[in-house]
A protein has these predicted regions:
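C-terminal non-catalytic regions of proteins with extracellular/luminal or membrane-system context
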Residues: 1-167
Length: 167
């Protein structure tokens, strides 16, 4: 997902210059990280020995730019099923798992949280998403701030209203 240039920009990709956007994969390779990018189950079996020797596994997860932004509502705002199953599969290897999440909305992460050692929620941050994400992963910067919205524990909690007048 986050190896795609368009996906990093989310619904902003219509206005962005994709030729100026690096993918997370590109930036990790520039940093000389020992990386493997399985794109199918066939490759998964071949990389298992390397994965078991890793210090940590970074999973880049998210939603397509086609389902985010204005006028793109979803009934279920959770990780897509295949991504949740992939997280569980990687967690079973016994290596630290870091989830990098790129979504255009808050999603319910209750099912995924127990299987992740850390979560870096990068939203759809635009043309410099990859550089800032990798800087955070390497500890060059400390990602901090206040969330602009609440995250639901489960989809059934939506919508969440606070400070609503009862009168």
């Amino acid at each position: 997902m986050l190896c795609e240039h368009h996906s990093l920009m989310g619904s902003w990709s219509g206005d962005g210059d994709v030729t100026r956007v690096k993918s997370i994969k590109d930036v990790l390779i520039e940093r000389k990280a020992k990386t493997v990018f399985p794109e199918s189950d066939y490759l998964w079996d071949g990389i298992l020995p390397m994965v078991r020797m890793a210090d940590a596994i970074v999973l880049t997860l998210g939603e397509s730019r086609k389902v985010t932004g204005e006028m793109n509502s979803l009934a279920k705002i959770e990780l897509p099923g295949e991504q949740l199953e992939f997280i569980k599969r990687v967690h079973a290897l016994g290596v630290k798992v870091i989830g990098v999440m790129a979504f255009g909305r808050p999603i319910a992460l209750s099912e995924a949280e127990p299987y992740l050692d850390a979560i870096l929620y990068v939203w759809h941050s635009g043309t410099k998403t990859a550089e800032s994400t990798v800087s955070a992963l390497y500890g060059d910067i400390n990602p901090s701030g206040k969330l602009p919205m609440s995250f639901p524990r489960f989809t059934g909690q939506v919508p969440i209203y606070y400070n609503r007048s009862k009168g």
